[in-house]
Amino acid sequence: IQIFNKDNATILTDLFDLETLDYYARKNCGFEVSKTEIDKYETEYRGGLQGDYSSEMDAKIDNVIDSLINYPESKRAVVMMNNGWWAHDDTDEAKCCRELHFFLTENYNDKTMLLNCSGIFRAQAVDIMPKNFYFVYKIMEVINEKLNKQTESKYLLGSYTHFVTILVPTRYD
C-alpha cells in the first residue's frame, strides 16, 4: 500500500466494526484498556492470546523511535512480537505477526520524509486480517507522532507491505 492511512487500513466486517478495531489497536500498541472494554470486545475467535501483541510494547516502540532518530538509514527499527522463546505447542505465544520493520524514505516529489513499515506474518486468517491491518496503521501513527515530537523534522506516514507465509480463510483452518 503506497500511502498507508486510516481509510485504507480500515476494513469493516461483522467480526470487526470500527470500535472493535480501535480497541485491539490501542491494546496492542500498549495503551491501557478497561475491564469493561476487555469484556465487551475480546473473544478467542478474534485472536485470543495469540493475537495479543501488547507485551512490552512501550519499550519496543521507544526502541524503534531511538533507532530511527539515531540511525535513520539503518534497518534496526524492528518490533518483534514474541515475548521470548516459545515452544511450538504453546499456541498463545505462536503470534501470527512476527515482526514489524520500520524505515524512513524521502518522498521524491516534495522531499518530505516518510515512515514506512513491512509486516511479516507467520500465518494470517483472512477473517482476522482487518485487526492486523488496523493495528499496523495505529502503531505507525503512534511512532510517527512520537518521531515528530522528538525531532525537528516532519514525518508523514508512508507505505506498508504485508508479507504472509501461510494464508488461510478462517482462524480455525
Q: Which ranges hold each PLM region?
A:
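Terminal, non-catalytic protein-protein interaction segments that mediate quaternary/complex assembly
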Residues: I1-D173
